[in-house]
Amino acid sequence: MANLRKTHPLLKIANDALVDLPTPSNISAWWNFGSLLGLCLISQILTGLFLAMHYTSDISTAFSSVAHICRDVNYGWLIRNLHANGASFFFICLYLHIARGLYYGSYLYKETWNIGVVLFLLVMMTAFVGYVLPWGQMSFWGATVITNLLSAVPYVGNSLVQWIWGGFSVDNATLTRFFAFHFLFPFVVAGATMIHLLFLHETGSSNPVGLNSDADKVPFHPYFSYKDLLGFIIMLTALTMLALFYPNLLGDPDNFTPANPMVTPPHIKPEWYFLFAYAILRSIPNKLGGVLALLSSILVLMVVPILHTSKQRGLTFRPASQLLFWILVADMLVLTWIGGMPVEHPYIIIGQVASVLYFSLFLVLNPLVGWLENKVMNW
């Protein structure tokens, strides 16, 4: 009799994705981040669900309800710290996952890559609306500043902003709808993840050497299920350490003050994982231009497959392109640093140079160097 996991309509899908999936035998730990992102999503949904049981999305009680969760709910402080720092780990894994894709040419699976960029945008939106919920100073002013960017849209901008606010400023209606969105989006992300996996399993994973691996595949279980399990243990240990020993390390002290529309914080800035995009936004001394640059900083990932000029897939055997990749990593770190700095000399010019370099690397330098490497190989 055939095995149930190979015949049952539902188990067959899980089996083809997690047990009998033919996997390249040489994929490294850089291929662990997909499953780690899945773990992050599950952990965020679970901790978020328990937080939502005690949270109230009303401006008069939101801040107090979060304090109540931390003080009075059994292990509420732990659930909240895991949820807040879990978001940071989510983005760490996201950035490493995208970096892996850029380094090893995974973006040549265009459908998988484009769904991935959409997922990235969805997770960013989820994190943004979630940051507003504790209704601290930085929650309120972050929401005000970022939603205000929509007023740069020609003709309909102001109407659009008031429509999102549900009034003439960030107020009760805004908080209520942001809570609704924050509850909904993770499930949309989970659905999009299924599509992401569906497209990935049409082609199979790429691998570190960038060659066809059909001749050398192994079953996903037990080899990579155990390898993923090791990644899970490492990440959960790191998350627990952060949540228990340094729970407020990555947060903003301003968010311990209840939201006050009458007092603007001296430096309005988003969470650390948005600082690179925020720096690009601030580098352009024009509202619409800044908003377009902000959008482009993420959407530029969509054009990476179109601008691939090299005959080789990954950067494993392309030292010149490797150099550009690591310059991009350094540039992202510089932008992250600048995003958290006040708008004054010399930070303004550093941010502008870093922003120009960011787009140049994607749109000009990488395709150019790929083309040059082809020439050198033929020579």
Curated annotation (Swiss-Prot):
Binding site for heme b b562: H83, H182
InterPro entries: Cyt_b/b6_C, Cyt_b/b6_C_sf, Cyt_b/b6_N, Cytb/b6-like_sf, Cytochrome_b, Cytochrome_b_C_euk/bac, Cytochrome_b_N_euk/bac, Di-haem_cyt_TM
Record key words, sorted: Electron transport, Heme, Iron, Membrane, Metal-binding, Mitochondrion, Mitochondrion inner membrane, Respiratory chain, Transmembrane, Transmembrane helix, Transport, Ubiquinone
Primary subcellular site in the record, as a coarse category: mitochondrion
Residues annotated as transmembrane: 33-53, 77-98, 113-133, 178-198, 226-246, 288-308, 320-340, 347-367
GO annotation terms (biological process): mitochondrial electron transport, ubiquinol to cytochrome c
GO molecular function, one term: ubiquinol-cytochrome-c reductase activity
Keyword Transport tagged: yes
Protein location: Mitochondrion inner membrane
CC cofactor note: Binds 2 heme b groups non-covalently.
Binding annotation for a ubiquinone: H201
UniProt cofactor(s): heme b
GO annotations of cellular component type: mitochondrial inner membrane; respiratory chain complex III
Family named by the database record: Belongs to the cytochrome b family.
PANTHER family: CYTOCHROME B
Protein name, UniProt field: Cytochrome b
Record organism: Anguilla dieffenbachii (New Zealand longfin eel)
Taxonomy of the source species: Eukaryota, Metazoa, Chordata, Craniata, Vertebrata
